[in-house]
Swiss-Prot record:
It comes from Yersinia pestis. GO terms for biological process: cell adhesion. Its main location: secreted. Pfam families: Antig_Caf1 (PF09255). Residues 100-150 are annotated as: Contains potential antigenic determinants that may stimulate T-cells. The keyword Nucleus does not apply. It comes from the Bacteria. It is found in: Secreted, Capsule. This is F1 capsule antigen.
Amino acid sequence: MKKISSVIAIALFGTIATANAADLTASTTATATLVEPARITLTYKEGAPITIMDNGNIDTELLVGTLTLGGYKTGTTSTSVNFTDAAGDPMYLTFTSQDGNNHQFTTKVIGKDSRDFDISPKVNGENLVGDDVVLATGSQDFFVRSIGSKGGKLAAGKYTDAVTVTVSNQ
């Protein structure tokens, strides 16, 4: 009888131990936020007509037009912006006449921020001045200003340039 009672005791203790070993659970909600990539925009507004001087050139610092860049991330700096064109002249954009005579003039691209510092983006890989300024929130105007004829006299007519912008670190 002693042998049977010890077997029964072991069976009862095993059942008690199993009953007290409950499974514990915890839960949480995992989330992830997805944002759309920056979608930059570039628009151009032509300035007032420019008068050709008697020598066939144009004055410097005349407003040719305004490039407005938008859609970049807050905190983007001026040297993160690179305007390019087919001529590829470092620091300058080249406008070409549409009369078929290939008259050209060059421009620089600058801006002003609220602190009245020059904002100098890269143009064809190089910037005109060394200031690296945080761009305005939302959009930034860049002023396209004349430098002068690119060899030879200019003729009256429409001048154009196909400008592409790349903004780094977006």
